[in-house]
Amino acid sequence: MDFIFKCVSGNEIVFKGLDTEGKVKGIEGYKYLLFDELDHYLREEWNQANISLRGMPGMKLFATWNPVSEKLWIKGYLDSMEWDDMPLVIDDDPYTQLHHNSFVRRSKDGKTILIKTTYFDNKWAVGGEGYGFLDQNLIDEYEQLLLLDPNSYRVNVLGDWGVPEVSRPYCQNF
């Protein structure tokens, strides 16, 4: 099923499910493709999408994921590239300032941008000067997670790569 958002300008944003490999191979007429939760896809599926869209002017692949394990193919893929750090703020605009635990990097070949953000960058949770709001309950939950499950805190709060742990397998099964 497709979901289509029509903008006032007349542009459309089309959300199309690509839940089978055949759909990715047959995609036509799209310039942008978003993989939400890339950690749930195989490297081969990412490669197939890249091949399917190659040659289209302005084609871009986007992906979001949580770095749940340093053993994910994504980490190896990113580690194989060389990166340049980019500024954490655009034109001294405080609304674009990223937290010190975040980063923006561009691959040396200029084909890939990597942006790491955390909840500290979400001004609708942590508040901002003149905008957003402070969600103290959410912040308290995140900070409690540090005490209960440091690995989950590292992944879900700080956005760092997770390290598989088996020290408390009973607790993590329930």
Where on the chain are the PLM-derived regions?
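Short clusters of hydrophobic/aromatic residues that line enzyme substrate/ligand-binding pockets
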Residues: 24, 74, 157
